[in-house]
Amino acid sequence: MKSGIHPDYVETTVLCGCGASFTTRSTKKSGNITVEVCSQCHPFYTGKQKILDSGGRVARFEKRYGKRSK
């Protein structure tokens, strides 16, 4: 690597909105990163994920106008 052109790579504490924190390394100068969700509180990782019905609009259209026959 070329010397003098790369930012310092320091230990950084990541603070989550749920209160969890962990240490990693980053080039951010303040040494602290604040995030809204982490792996301890994100619904995908905690198993509290909601399944959304994405077919609602299509079903409503088919109900109004009927299915298209080929």
Swiss-Prot record:
Presence of the UniProt keyword rRNA-binding in the record: yes
The Gene Ontology biological process terms listed for this entry are: translation
Q: How is the cofactor bound?
A: Binds 1 zinc ion per subunit.
Give the matching InterPro entries: Ribosomal_bL28/bL31-like_sf, Ribosomal_bL31, Ribosomal_bL31_A, Ribosomal_bL31_sf
Cellular component (GO) terms are: ribonucleoprotein complex; ribosome
Q: Which cofactor does it need?
A: Zn(2+)
Q: Keywords, A to Z?
A: Metal-binding, Ribonucleoprotein, Ribosomal protein, RNA-binding, rRNA-binding, Zinc
Q: Which SUPFAM superfamilies match?
A: L28p-like
Q: Which residues does the annotation say bind Zn(2+)?
A: 16, 18, 38, 41
Please provide, alphabetically and separated by semicolons, the GO molecular function terms listed in this UniProt record.
metal ion binding; rRNA binding; structural constituent of ribosome
Asked if the record carries the keyword Metal-binding, the reply is: yes
> How does this chain assemble?
Part of the 50S ribosomal subunit.
Q: Which family does it belong to?
A: Belongs to the bacterial ribosomal protein bL31 family. Type A subfamily.
Tell me the HAMAP family matching this sequence: Ribosomal_bL31_1
Free-text function comment from the UniProt entry: Binds the 23S rRNA.
Record-given protein name:
Large ribosomal subunit protein bL31
**What is this organism's lineage?**
Bacteria, Bacillati, Actinomycetota, Actinomycetes, Mycobacteriales
